[in-house]
């Protein structure tokens, strides 16, 4: 059976190129959540380099005109996934002090959260990814998705901010997976050129 790999794609295309490379090397089913503005979303809709089995466009999904706020549904999600959705939303910069374009009401925030949860739950339960490849969460909806995946034992790996030509891959956004002992690597007689490489 083919592995199902989901990429959380951003405007910087790092995860798109990672998916492209992996699609050439591995027989897998590829999925994508595209978290970008309109123009980059158009690129994803029109691209033909990667055969994604399914793509979801987050901005379209979370802004659906859903006037039926269901607090019971959100409570069920909080219990099933052991989440505090309101706490995540309170820490979202777009909902509060640093976003001057729109003052979100509590109902608007909860409706957006409900739309996120419905999308994420559908992906987790219907498509059942084996692996999620993403970056460190900078916005609450990615943190929410990661927590929901972890609760259902879906492996999540995060590509950390690159340092030079190296990239750290980890399971957590707050800790390293495994740090080798200091004496396991040799750093004697290194030149400046060695450090640059």
Protein language model annotation of sequence segments:
Residues 21, 25-117, 161-197:
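Conserved N-terminal ligand/cofactor-binding loop architecture of enzyme catalytic domains
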Residues 14-17, 40-41, 140-143:
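Short, well-ordered alpha-helical microsegments
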Residues 10, 112, 136-137:
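Residues that cap or flank secondary-structure elements
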Residues 2-12, 34-36, 133:
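Nucleotide-activated donor-dependent transferases that construct or modify glycoconjugates
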Residues 118-181:
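Conserved nucleotide-sugar donor-interacting segment of glycosyltransferase catalytic cores
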Residues 9-26:
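Histidine-anchored nucleotide/phosphate-binding helix
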